[in-house]
From Swiss-Prot:
Record region (ACP-binding): 254-258
EC numbers on record: 2.3.1.180
Keyword hit for Acyltransferase: yes
Domain notes: The last Arg residue of the ACP-binding site is essential for the weak association between ACP/AcpP and FabH.
Name of the protein in its database record: Beta-ketoacyl-[acyl-carrier-protein] synthase III
Length: 326
């Protein structure tokens, strides 16, 4: 017998403010349209955090929903991992703020920063903690307020991103170790820092002393995304001992519909096996995968025993995949 990290609870939170593409059409000097945005990204609307609403507050709300779904109390959690690139403060971590917000009195907490690949990296960390016996239950959260780092004069980026949070609870359970058993079957992580200029924020504590805004070379990111996401997903499946034909759902990072459809096509799967939420959420960076998972579970598409592939790529570049049996 071995220990598997099994999903036992999930939840998400989206800010109240819904921003349709029409709001960007009305912005002076931006020169964009609903048709232009939909054609290039598939995005119809996104959610923006209210003034004063923080990443940690959204993370706490999503976490409470995941705890309710799992019928657990905060003190049942051994560790909290938050994937985010938009923390409330330089320090302490958002994860410790979540601990405080939930009223947790024990365990440990830390943040992971891999931008849009953050949730995949956080899942891999949580899995390692569980299978090594260092934690039994881990609360894994992706939460972002990307609306705070947008360049509102750049139509190629500001229309793409949204805010939100998603939370998943993993629990260690005995397993025979077969691909048919529930839990995380494999993880596959990569990064290449030589591509920093393709996607970054031009501010920081030790450099400019400012928050900065997001900068992206979209065409180059697209090219790397299709190649790297397909390869990491293939590797993840091979590590798990399963094939593309075994996959019930792909739950990708919701970057834009072109990257999602291009990757899945190269992967050899139809779009009806993909959980797509980008039209409603935009790109919520590290929050996008748990948001999509939560929607898929909530509407009944994702069922116990289903085989899921999650994959993501973000600034760094950093990318990876996780294969799990729900």
């Amino acid at each position: 017998m071995i220990i598997r990290a099994v999903p036992v609870g999930i939840g998400h939170y989206l800010p109240e403010r819904v921003v349709p593409n029409a709001e960007f059409e009305a912005m002076e000097g931006l020169e964009t349209s609903d048709e232009w945005i939909r054609a290039r990204s598939g995005i119809e609307r996104r959610h923006f955090a209210a003034e004063g609403e923080t990443t940690s507050q959204m993370a706490v709300t999503a976490a409470r929903k995941a705890l309710d779904h799992a019928a657990l109390n905060p003190d049942d959690i051994d560790a909290v991992i938050v994937a985010t690139s938009t923390p409330d403060l330089t320090f302490p971590s958002v994860a410790t703020m979540v601990q405080a917000g939930l009223g947790m009195t024990g365990g440990f907490a830390f943040d992971v920063q891999a931008v849009c690949a953050g949730f995949v990296y956080a899942l891999a960390n949580a899995n390692a903690l569980i299978v090594s016996g260092q934690a039994n239950r881990v609360l894994v959260i992706g939460a972002e307020t990307f609306s705070r780092i947008m360049d509102w004069t750049d139509r190629t980026t500001c229309v793409l991103f949204g805010d939100g949070a998603g939370a998943l609870i993993l629990e260690g359970r005995d397993s025979a170790g077969t691909p048919q058993d529930r839990g995380i079957l494999s993880t596959d992580l990569h990064s290449d820092g030589t591509h920093r200029e393709l996607l970054y924020v031009d501010g920081g504590v030790s450099s400019t002393g400012t928050t900065g805004v997001l900068k992206m070379q979209g065409k180059e990111v697209f090219r790397h995304a299709i190649e790297k996401l397909t390869k990491t997903a293939d590797t993840g499946l091979a590590k798990a001992g399963v094939t593309v034909g075994d996959v019930d759902w792909v739950v990708p990072h919701q970057a834009n519909i072109r990257i999602i459809s291009g990757t899945v096509k190269k992967f050899g799967l139809p779009m009806d096996k993909v959980i797509v939420t980008v039209q409603d959420h935009g790109n919520t960076s590290a929050a996008s995968i748990p948001l999509a998972m939560s929607v898929g579970v909530g509407d009944g598409r994702i069922q116990p025993g289903h085989l899921l592939v999650t994959e993501a790529i973000g600034g760094g570049l950093a990318w990876g995949a996780v294969v799990m049996r729900w």
